[in-house]
Regions:
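Soluble ligand-binding/transfer domains with enclosed cavities or grooves
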Residues: 1-258
Length: 258
């Protein structure tokens, strides 16, 4: 695990990883997954490892030119320029809360966050079949199904400046393939893309402990609904960078669960 963390740390969550580094990371992920095969992610002894706050540390996606499985358009080439990523989180919490969060600085100056909050459940066999879509990879009994609410986009780190609700609801799957005290490894339900999540960086007293909790203040605020007025405010904030993509599409893409 230490070797895996050492390899992924300088890769900007996988975006800048070379083909050689990506191959080394993939081999380590495969080895850890194989060592954990047959384990029950929902067993009592694993609850403390599964249900906690996590930083998205790595996404095994070969190209992030237009979008990334963790962060959607925010983490595409243009998105990374406009919305400079400060932090990226995914939390699976008891009793049934799942949260994806990207914290950014608009044009490197204005802090903000995009938050997807939803409800998780253990995916049934029928649900796993639906979540696979066209993937050839079978999903295990450790798969989580998440029903996400409409995305919330907040300006000011906790939404104090402006909070908007933009985009549709969504349903996604995430197959848990490895757990230990430091990390969680999962595969996207429909893509099979590997994700590495770090819990040690979000634990109480760790560098990202406070930031990983700020999503709660964002979702507690009453957002403006999607409307012409909201879009006008949105554009005034400098976010209308969508000559090639409708505004709501930037916030409709689930993060780290594709």
């Amino acid at each position: 695990v230490s070797q895996l963390i050492e390899l992924i740390e300088p890769t900007d969550r996988g975006v800048s990883a070379t083909a050689e580094t990506r191959g080394q990371i993939s081999a380590l992920i495969d080895r850890l997954e194989e060592s954990w095969r047959g384990s029950d992610a929902f067993a009592t002894e694993n609850e403390a490892l599964l249900f906690r706050r996590n930083e998205v540390a790595y996404v095994g996606q070969t190209s992030s030119v237009s979008a990334n499985a963790a962060g959607g358009k925010y983490r595409g080439r243009l998105g990374r320029l406009v919305f400079r990523t400060d932090a990226l989180f995914q939390h699976v919490l008891l009793p049934d809360v799942a949260v994806n969060v990207i914290q950014f600085k608009l044009l490197g100056l204005i802090p903000g966050a995009a938050v997807l909050k939803g409800r998780w459940s253990v995916a049934s066999e029928e649900a796993r079949s639906e979540l696979r879509r066209n993937s050839t990879r079978a999903l295990s009994s450790n798969c989580v199904a998440v029903d996400f609410d409409a995305p919330i986009v907040a300006f000011g780190r906790t939404g104090g400046a402006l909070t908007l609700e933009l985009g549709p609801t969504s349903k996604v799957g995430l197959d848990v393939t490895y757990l230990d005290e430091r990390i969680r490894i999962c595969r996207g339900g429909s893509s099979g893309t590997p994700f590495v999540f770090r819990a040690d960086s979000c634990a109480d007293g760790a560098p990202l402990a406070d930031a990983s909790n700020q999503w709660q203040l964002c979702v507690e605020r009453r957002p403006l609904q999607q409307s012409p007025a909201a879009f006008a405010t949105f554009a005034a904030a400098g976010l209308c960078v969508t000559g090639w993509l409708p505004v709501s599409r930037w916030f409709a893409l689930p993060m780290a669960v594709a």
